């Protein structure tokens, strides 16, 4: 990791500039501009089909935009050669919606997989790091010998988080981290996301439809609309009440919604938006 003493927390780790993505003739993202300062957690919310997951994958170099550029630590992800990109992706951690664990491996080998792919370490070191990460996400040591199919959905999510953090990444991306979980387990995952941020200076992107998660873990929230241009500062709500680029009526509704004063479902906000446009 880079030395935090030499870098300002206000320096963007990720800087997306006018990125657009098309699939065939369909516009998925249109001129998206956003920055993610070091150490902050950004939540991306929006209705189904608005491009949340596409935006997330573009920010980490998994989808190449048709226009625009994504800067990571002041370097253009899409101008890196394959070796440079591979080294940069080591600095990312991914927590997938379905945990994406390898069924052919036990939990120990699932969590150890990134170490064996990217580092040279002896088995004693690997074991110590894996067991420490499992403990940090609240899993007992006996889980290490189990297969993913033997675990509950919440336990698999925690294994996915342990694996994502095993290399101490600078950027962690969470794709719908609480989908399919009951409220109690959702709160556990949210607390683990916060605990990760407290343990070391990590920057995070959380794609979610869960307003409780957005309120709990994020410093900043982006409301993404289908095929709408997003300028710096626009559709971004700071929970301290800072102004946004939304018009006043819509701004109030979005703020209320994110704070939980207008309900917990995105379709409620969608109905509000439709009434504003009618």
Which residues fall in each region the model found?
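Helix-to-loop junction immediately C-terminal to a conserved catalytic motif
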Residues: 60
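Conserved ABC transporter NBD signature motif
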Residues: 68-76
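Conserved ABC ATPase "signature" region
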Residues: 75-76, 123-142
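Short coil-to-helix segment of the ABC ATPase nucleotide-binding domain corresponding to the Q-loop/switch region
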Residues: 105-113
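Conserved ABC ATPase signature
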Residues: 147-151, 155
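Conserved catalytic motifs of ABC-family nucleotide-binding domains
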Residues: 168
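Catalytic Walker B motif of ABC-type/P-loop ATPase nucleotide-binding domains
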Residues: 172-175
């Amino acid at each position: 990791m880079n030395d935090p003493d030499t870098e300002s927390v206000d320096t963007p780790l990720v800087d997306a500039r006018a990125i657009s993505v098309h699939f065939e003739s369909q516009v998925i993202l249109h001129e998206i501009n956003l920055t993610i300062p070091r150490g902050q957690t950004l939540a991306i919310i929006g209705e189904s089909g608005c491009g949340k997951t596409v935006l997330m994958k573009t920010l980490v170099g998994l989808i190449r935009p048709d226009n625009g550029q994504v800067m990571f630590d002041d370097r253009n992800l899409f101008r890196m050669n394959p070796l440079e990109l591979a080294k940069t992706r080591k600095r990312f951690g991914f927590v997938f919606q379905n945990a994406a664990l390898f069924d052919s491996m036990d939990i120990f080998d699932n969590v150890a997989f990134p170490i064996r792919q990217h580092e040279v370490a002896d088995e004693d070191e690997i074991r110590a790091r894996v067991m420490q990460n499992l403990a940090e996400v609240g899993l007992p040591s006996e889980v290490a010998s189990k297969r993913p199919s033997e675990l509950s959905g919440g336990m698999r999510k925690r294994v996915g988080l342990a694996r994502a953090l095993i290399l101490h990444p600078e950027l962690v991306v969470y794709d719908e981290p609480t989908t399919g979980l009951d409220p109690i387990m959702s709160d556990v995952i949210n607390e683990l996301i916060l605990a990760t941020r407290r343990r070391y200076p990590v920057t995070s992107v959380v794609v979610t439809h869960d307003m409780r998660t957005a309120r709990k873990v994020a410093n900043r929230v982006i409301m993404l609309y289908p095929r709408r241009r997003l300028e710096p500062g626009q559709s971004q709500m700071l929970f301290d009440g800072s102004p946004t680029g939304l018009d006043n009526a819509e701004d109030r509704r979005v703020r209320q919604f994110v704070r939980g004063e207008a309900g917990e479902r995105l379709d409620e906000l969608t109905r509000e938006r439709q009434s504003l446009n009618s």
